[in-house]
Design a protein with these regions (language model features):
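Mobile-element integrase/transposase regions
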Residues: 2-54, 62-69, 115
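Short small-residue beta-strand/loop micro-motif enriched in glycine and branched aliphatics
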Residues: 52-57, 95, 122
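Active-site beta-loop-alpha junctions of metal-dependent nucleic acid enzymes
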Residues: 56-81, 103
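Acidic/histidine-rich, metal-coordinating catalytic segments
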Residues: 80-102
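RNase H-like two-metal-ion nuclease catalytic core shared by retroviral integrases
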Residues: 88, 101, 121-143
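Charged helix-capping and loop-helix junction motifs
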Residues: 102-108
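RNase H-like polynucleotidyl transferase catalytic core
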Residues: 109-111, 115-132, 151
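Active-site-proximal acidic segments at structured loop/helix or strand boundaries
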Residues: 139-194
């Protein structure tokens, strides 16, 4: 009997210091503020692959200007720029999706942004989210925000995101056995300067 199930598990590959960061959004979370207003929020997520250091920002938009702003802030917070930025096929990055049969086409503005910072854009193959598992795996952590539904204003919600992010960066990471906030200090020496 032949098994037609495809196993999507991949061999875990650790990247070197400063080599890669993975970018994604936790998208379209409906959240009720303490005023009763329902907002749709997104969480920008960047994970440095070696140290697993995470940088997250809350946003009401995923437009390209916001993406550039958050990447600027993230690179500054981490202390440098990785060689490669791994991303999915989000419209603010890609004009044409990368597939198994096509390399895709990076958006001209995003490519200029990448050139200015000196990193290579590496889009994942469409439909294969496990190829950027370092940023995908922690996304479920943001469901914790629903425990505060109706209790916080936008500024407090932003503070809560920063608090959760800091807590996660200060805990021993289960895969690498190190604390990301301390481990990024080693990785900084291998990141390109701002």
């Amino acid at each position: 009997i032949r098994n037609n199930m495809t196993n999507h598990r991949s061999i875990k590959r650790e990247t070197g210091m400063g080599v890669e960061a993975q970018l994604d959004w936790k998208e379209n979370m409906h959240y009720t503020l303490n005023t009763g207003e329902v907002i749709e929020l997104n969480i920008f997520a960047l994970v440095y692959s070696y140290s697993r250091y995470r940088i997250n920002f809350i946003s009401l938009t995923k437009k390209q200007g916001a993406l550039f702003h958050y990447l600027d802030q993230a690179f500054e917070a981490a202390g440098g720029v990785p060689d490669i930025l791994k991303t999915d096929n989000m419209k603010t990055v890609m004009d044409e999706a990368r597939t198994e049969y096509s390399s895709g086409k990076v958006n001209a503005k995003f490519q200029q942004f990448a050139n200015d910072y000196g990193f290579v854009v590496k889009p994942c193959i469409a439909g294969k989210p496990w190829s950027k598992g370092k940023v995908e795996a922690p996304m479920k952590l943001w469901d914790e925000l629903y425990a505060y539904n109706g209790k916080l204003n936008y500024a407090q919600l932003n503070e809560k995101v920063m608090e959760i992010n800091e807590r996660n960066n200060c805990q021993v990471h289960s895969e690498i056995g190190k604390i990301p906030k301390l481990h990024i200090q080693k990785e900084k020496d291998f990141l390109s300067p701002l």
